[in-house]
Structures are given as structure tokens and as C-alpha cells.
Design a protein with these regions (language model features):
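Transmembrane beta-strand segments of Gram-negative outer membrane beta-barrel proteins
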Residues: 19-37, 67-69, 158
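Signature for the C-terminal beta-barrel architecture of outer-membrane proteins
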Residues: 21-24, 60, 64-66, 105-106, ...
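Transmembrane beta-strands of outer-membrane beta-barrel pores
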Residues: 30-36, 57-59, 71-79, 104-106, ...
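Surface-exposed strand-loop-strand hairpins of Gram-negative outer-membrane beta-barrel proteins
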Residues: 31-49
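Residues on the lipid-exposed face of transmembrane beta-strands in outer-membrane beta-barrel proteins
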Residues: 51-57, 97-104, 148-152, 177-181, ...
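Outer membrane beta-barrel
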Residues: 58-160, 181, 340
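C-terminal structural cap/anchor segments
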Residues: 257-322
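Outer-membrane beta-barrel "beta-signal"
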Residues: 323, 328-330, 335-337, 355-372
Length: 372
């Protein structure tokens, strides 16, 4: 990153270039949730304090070129069964994003810890190659990945983007490329990535060597609709494949201040030789997900997520009510209802109740968040 800064200082003319400034924002959130039927010798309450700070601004400006930056830092303090079961550390200080970007109207080059996110899936995201966000969480947060990314804006409706991500095993790199464009009236994108074995444990499939390719397409005809798919080809032992796809639709009904309903169907299937990470060793499974949200007035908004596994009959229902105390201070009432229609509580994909805390147990909680 130091080399990156020095390069642009040297090669961009110095007259009227320096334009360093800084802005900041962030939020503090604290809350606790009561775990129904917490595992034996585990605490009943899972509590968290989360502090998030973001600094951004410009470093250099020359004609149409801008060199800017963003630094995000976060602190988590956790207590409860998620710590006792080693799902989360008791204390965690980390940098979700730290990057430099050189850009103009036609291109941008960005280096550092950054988000690499694309695709149209909302609940299920086959193209979330570097996605860690829980969209049903109170304050969803996506971690960045250390990388170099270059984007060319070919027109107002099309772009070409490439990236390199250190795999953290020797000198191995994860290279990828994607293109977004309009296909008639449909927003369309394609992606290709080579994925060597890596130490990036925050992301799925890190232990496999794969070629990954996919597409997404989105349109609107009274209702919104989209499809997003990914094909993984494992390099060993005989190039077996895994295919993930999601079909989604949404519509806002003119009920009250607008009732938004979204539905997605997700299918994952793989050949026998593909390295499976499913707890049951099942090669094919499919989920359906719903979300509904509606503002009641300026101060109150409710939402609910519902997920169901057709194969093992497990489910999750995640309601939340947001109450705006002021423009910057919010109160969240949230819960989680997990279960299994077949009565199997030990190894569902969406619900598990065992002697160890899994994070899928039913709960009810309260969180306060202050944004600044």
C-alpha cells in the first residue's frame, strides 16, 4: 500500500495536487438476546457491544483524477453461549475495510481491504464469492478481503472489472473477472474466477482448488424478478462440479405505506466426487426464503425473514421491529424462531439444538444503535 501511494505522488504532477481531507462516521450498538433452552452449562443471555468507526476522504486531486481512501475499524465485545461454544471470540478488534482508490469517470483502481460484491440475490447469494454478511442481522456488516481491483466503466450501463486476491498460501493468487451490461431491458452480468486452495477461512470453499463461473440477470415486469447462478469445477480428483442457483421475485403492495414482499428459491447440487461440506453428506438440497417489510410511520418499521429447507424440514423465522427514537438513535426488537417439522433437532441445516450452542436456537432480544 505504501508503494501505491508513492507511485501516484511521483507520477502525478505536484501543482495543485494535494487535497487531503477527512470525514468520519460510525455507530455504536449494544444489545442482548435471551436464548430459549440454552445448552447445558451455557449462559442464557448472549450479549454484544459493537463499535464501528469509518474515516474517508481525499488525498490527491489533479484534473479529473482523484486518489481517495477509506479506513474502517471495529470492536466487538461478546459474552454468552456464542463465546462458550467458540463461535465468536470474546474480544475482537479488526479492520473491515482499508483501501486506497485512484479514479476518474472512466476507471478506478483500488487496493487494500475492500468489498468484492455483485449479483442480484438477496437472501441467497451464489455469486457471493467473498460475502460474509448476514442480511437478517440487526446491523448487517460485510467484511472486506485484501485485494487489488480494477474497474473500467465502458458506458453508463456497462463495466468490466478484474481482481487479484492473495490466497495466503505461498504466492498463490485468486484472479477473477466480471462484466455487467444491459441485455435488452435486463440487467445482466457474468463472472469467472480461478480459486486455488487458500487460508481465507472466512469464505466458503477456501480449502478447494476450483474454477468458478456464473451469471446474474434481473428485470422488472410489474414485479421484480432475478436469477443468479454459479458453477464450481473442482480440480481434483476428476473435475466434479457443484451448481448453485437462486430464482427471486419481489413486489410492493399498496397497503399502508407500502408492504414489500420478497421470495427466493435456492437449489444446490453437486456430483458425487465433489468435496462436500454438508453436515449430512447430502449432495442436493433446496431452500425457500421469504422476507416482508413495511414502514408503519416515520418512526416504526417491521420486517420478517423466513427460511425453510425442503429436504430436512428445518426452518428459521426472524422478526424485527425498528423504532426510531431520534434521527440517529434506533431501538431494535428482534427474535429468532427455529425448528424442524420432523422433530429432528440435532442436525438440521437451518436449526440445531444440541449440547453445544449453534446460533440457530430460538431467541428474543433488544438492541440499541446510535449512528453518528
Amino acid at each position: 500500500m505504501t508503494f501505491f501511494i508513492l507511485f501516484f505522488i511521483i507520477f502525478i504532477p505536484n501543482s495543485h495536487v494535494w487535497a487531503f481531507d477527512m470525514d468520519y462516521d460510525g455507530h455504536i450498538a449494544t444489545g442482548s438476546q435471551y436464548i430459549f433452552d440454552s445448552p447445558p452449562s451455557h449462559k442464557d443471555f448472549d450479549s454484544e457491544l459493537h463499535v464501528h468507526l469509518e474515516f474517508d476522504g481525499n488525498i490527491l486531486k489533479k484534473n479529473e483524477l482523484t486518489l481517495d481512501y477509506e479506513i474502517e475499524t471495529a470492536l466487538n465485545l461478546i459474552d454468552g453461549p456464542s463465546v462458550q461454544s467458540n463461535l465468536r471470540p470474546e474480544e475482537d478488534i479488526y479492520l473491515p475495510r482499508t483501501w486506497l482508490r485512484l479514479s476518474n469517470d472512466f476507471f478506478q483502481f483500488r487496493v487494500g481491504r475492500q468489498e468484492i460484491l455483485f449479483g442480484d440475490g438477496v437472501i441467497f447469494q451464489p455469486l457471493g464469492l467473498f460475502e460474509t454478511r448476514d442480511v437478517s442481522g440487526v446491523v448487517p456488516e460485510s467484511l472486506g478481503v485484501d485485494s487489488f481491483r480494477a474497474t473500467w466503466f465502458l458506458s453508463d450501463v456497462s463495466l468490466l472489472e478484474t481482481w487479484l486476491v492473495p490466497a495466503k498460501i505461498g504466492t498463490a493468487l485468486i484472479p477473477g473477472i466480471r462484466a455487467d451490461f444491459l441485455l435488452g431491458e435486463f440487467e445482466t452480468g457474468v463472472v469467472f474466477q480461478y480459486h486455488p486452495k487458500s487460508d481465507l477461512e472466512d469464505f466458503s470453499g477456501y480449502e478447494r482448488e476450483m474454477i468458478q463461473m456464473g451469471y446474474h440477470i434481473k428485470g422488472e415486469r410489474e414485479v421484480g424478478f432475478w436469477n443468479e447462478s454459479r458453477l464450481d469445477i473442482e480440480m481434483e480428483p476428476s473435475s466434479p462440479v457443484q451448481f448453485d442457483t437462486v430464482f427471486g421475485t419481489d413486489y410492493t403492495f399498496e397497503i399502508g405505506k407500502g408492504l414489500h414482499i420478497l421470495m427466493e428459491y435456492f437449489l444446490s447440487t453437486q456430483q458425487k466426487e465433489f468435496s462436500t461440506s454438508d453436515l449430512k453428506g447430502q449432495r442436493t438440497y433446496h431452500h425457500i426464503g421469504f422476507s416482508m417489510d413495511q414502514p408503519i410511520d416515520i418512526e416504526i418499521k417491521w420486517q420478517i425473514y423466513s427460511l425453510y429447507d425442503f429436504l430436512d424440514k428445518s426452518f428459521q423465522i426472524i422478526p424485527q421491529i425498528e423504532y426510531s427514537i431520534t434521527d440517529d438513535l434506533f431501538l431494535y426488537f428482534h427474535g429468532k424462531i427455529g425448528g424442524d417439522i420432523n422433530g429432528n433437532k440435532t442436525n438440521g441445516r437451518l436449526y440445531q439444538r444440541t449440547n453445544s450452542f449453534s446460533g440457530t436456537e430460538s431467541s428474543i432480544g433488544l438492541t440499541v444503535a446510535n449512528y453518528f
